[in-house]
């Protein structure tokens, strides 16, 4: 997720030259730059390309109208408005809740601005990542070693044979490094519902408007059996569809 859209050019040197410098600085930071034709083109791109991580635009030309339209698609997406010293700032407290930052058109400031945009991008990715996923990403990134899990030692064991290398290349290193068990305390406990597991369950409940949510293993089948055994104790009379999922048959 490294795509930043720039709205422009504007046909005047004092705006286009700083943005040109910024484009080079952003590329050096590892970003991919795109130039939408207009606001409609930009909104369609955001709608169909969730990998975009920021939009740069001229405040005098687009102002809050564009921000509001983007917010309808992604309220967390960082927006970078460039202004001149005479720009009119008509922003309410409600508007400031947007992920909106302001910069002035200035030569020689591109590197510093690009670094700040990298920081804001990292904050954006951190904000949209669910708790357990974030903890798992951190665990893999830190390249920690556990004696008992995973048994294949982050995938290195697969690279001892030609067919093992094919398997490793197919799934990728992160898949195997993230293959961990309950012994990894940094990820909390699925049995005790603690740590990132608990945070994830609370996050799921908030997302779906539930009072409580639980993460279980073995997919929908096990989930159905757990709910069914709670809702229909021994001796209950059940009426189920003939073509129901096999998990309900297992429940019976």
Model-derived features with residue positions:
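Conserved N-terminal alpha-helix of the aminotransferase class I/II PLP-enzyme fold
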Residues: 172-222
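N-terminal "arm"/small-domain region of PLP-dependent enzymes with the aminotransferase-like
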Residues: 101-194
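Short amphipathic alpha-helix used as the core "switch/output" element in two-component signaling
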Residues: 64-74
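A short, hydrophobic beta-strand element within the central beta-sheet of small alpha/beta folds
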Residues: 55, 59, 76-91
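Acidic, metal-coordinating helix/loop segments flanking the phosphotransfer/catalytic sites
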Residues: 37-53
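Short hydrophobic/Thr-rich beta-strand motif most characteristic of the beta2 strand and flanking loop
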Residues: 30-38
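Conserved acidic segment of CheY-like receiver
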Residues: 2-26, 55, 252
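Conserved beta-loop-alpha segment that forms the PLP phosphate-binding cup at the N-terminus of a helix
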Residues: 212-236, 240, 246-250
């Amino acid at each position: 997720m490294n795509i930043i859209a720039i709205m422009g050019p504007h046909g005047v040197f004092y705006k286009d030259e700083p943005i040109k410098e910024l484009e080079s600085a952003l590329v050096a930071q590892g970003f991919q730059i795109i130039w939408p034709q207009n606001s409609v083109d930009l909104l369609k791109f955001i709608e169909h390309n969730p990998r975009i991580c920021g939009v740069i635009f001229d405040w005098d030309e687009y102002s809050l109208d564009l921000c509001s339209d983007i917010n309808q698609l992604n309220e967390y997406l960082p927006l970078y408005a460039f202004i001149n010293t005479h720009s009119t700032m008509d922003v309410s407290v409600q508007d400031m809740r947007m992920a909106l930052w302001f910069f002035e058109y200035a030569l020689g400031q591109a590197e510093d601005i690009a670094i700040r945009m990298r920081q804001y991008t990292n904050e954006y990715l951190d904000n949209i990542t669910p708790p357990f996923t974030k903890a798992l990403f951190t665990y893999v990134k830190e390249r920690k070693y556990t004696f008992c899990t995973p048994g294949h030692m982050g995938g290195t064991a697969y690279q001892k044979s030609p067919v093992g290398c094919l398997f490793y290349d197919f799934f990728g290193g992160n898949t195997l490094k993230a293959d961990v068990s309950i012994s990894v305390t940094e990820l909390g406990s699925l049995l005790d519902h603690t740590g990132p597991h608990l945070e994830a369950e609370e996050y799921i409940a908030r997302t779906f408007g539930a009072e409580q949510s639980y993460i279980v293993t073995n997919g929908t089948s096990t989930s159905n059996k757990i709910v069914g055994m709670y809702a229909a104790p021994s001796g209950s009379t059940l009426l189920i569809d003939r073509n129901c999922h096999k998990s309900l048959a297992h429940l019976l």
